[in-house]
């Protein structure tokens, strides 16, 4: 099923931000089957449980990809599946979402802790703030933020919190190093959630994979320019299949 790509969304905003990209990819290659799968709905932030759910739900021998948290989970699942995964692509996915000593270019821990507390107190207000950060760096940040938040499912805090806690726990560096299939990782130069410097850090960690930086774009670049992103993905897929 080398003509099938599974895309996983980011935290809190549902599948709608990925739909324009999926349509653009299909427009470029009618033989490519693009499937957007929602994140698991679990009351646990245990990484293994999330991966077990995804592994049981998603088909084998496909390309795995995702945006932000979805890309982090796709990375872990690709490493788990090994040769049962055709390849991996991530969009605005930091190997470590929260910064720490060995990975300084992430969200400051105190900022993340405030997010976590805010989500516990009022998840809808926190989601709006998250939407604004996703739209930071866009040509029309307010319009993009409204689009992101308006398309988000009405998710209770009990479902949002485990995903947010998962963001803080995940460190995909070992998974990315272990996965031997082709990889493409795209970052944004004006991202308000994933510092642009993470792109060069990842390239230093994985010098043999493709890492791209879209200079004038924010975290939701897949929604800002779905056709441009689709073109980069299609070129990557074509190159890998051609090899």
Task: Give residue spans per PLM region.
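Conserved alpha/beta-hydrolase catalytic His-Asp/Glu region
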Residues: 120-170, 174-175
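The conserved beta1-alpha1 loop
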Residues: 8-11, 67, 187-188
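Short beta-strand/loop motif that positions the catalytic acidic residue
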Residues: 179, 185-187, 191
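Flexible "cap/lid" loop of the alpha/beta hydrolase fold
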Residues: 85-118, 159-160
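Catalytic histidine-centered segment of alpha/beta-hydrolase-like enzymes
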Residues: 217-230
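Gly/Ala-rich beta-loop-alpha elbow adjacent to hydrolase catalytic centers
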Residues: 66-70, 74
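Conserved alpha/beta-hydrolase "acid-adjacent" motif
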Residues: 16, 192-198
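Conserved HGGG/HGGXW glycine-rich cap/lid loop of the alpha/beta-hydrolase fold
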Residues: 1-47
């Amino acid at each position: 099923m080398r003509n099938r790509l599974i895309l996983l969304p980011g935290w809190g905003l549902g599948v709608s931000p990925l739909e324009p990209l999926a349509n653009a990819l299909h427009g470029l290659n009618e033989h490519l089957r693009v499937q957007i799968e929602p994140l698991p709905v679990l009351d646990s932030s245990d990484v293994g449980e999330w991966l077990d759910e995804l592994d049981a739900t998603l088909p084998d021998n496909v390309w795995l990809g995702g945006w932000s948290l979805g890309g982090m989970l796709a990375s872990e699942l690709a490493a788990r599946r090994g040769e049962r995964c055709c390849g991996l692509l991530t969009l605005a996915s930091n190997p470590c979402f929260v910064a720490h000593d060995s990975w300084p270019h992430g969200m400051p821990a105190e900022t993340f802790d405030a997010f976590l507390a805010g989500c516990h107190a009022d998840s809808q207000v926190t989601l709006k703030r998250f939407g604004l950060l996703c739209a930071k760096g866009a040509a029309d940040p307010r319009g993009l933020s409204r689009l992101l938040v308006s398309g988000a499912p009405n998710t209770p805090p009990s479902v949002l919190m485990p995903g947010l806690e998962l963001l803080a726990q995940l460190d995909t560096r070992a998974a990315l190093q272990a996965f031997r299939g082709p990889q493409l990782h795209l970052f944004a130069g004006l991202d308000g959630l994933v510092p642009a410097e993470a792109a060069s850090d990842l390239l230093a960690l994985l010098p043999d994979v493709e890492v791209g930086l879209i200079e004038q774009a924010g975290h939701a670049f897949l929604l800002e320019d779905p056709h441009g992103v689709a073109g980069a993905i299609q070129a990557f897929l074509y190159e890998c299949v051609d090899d």
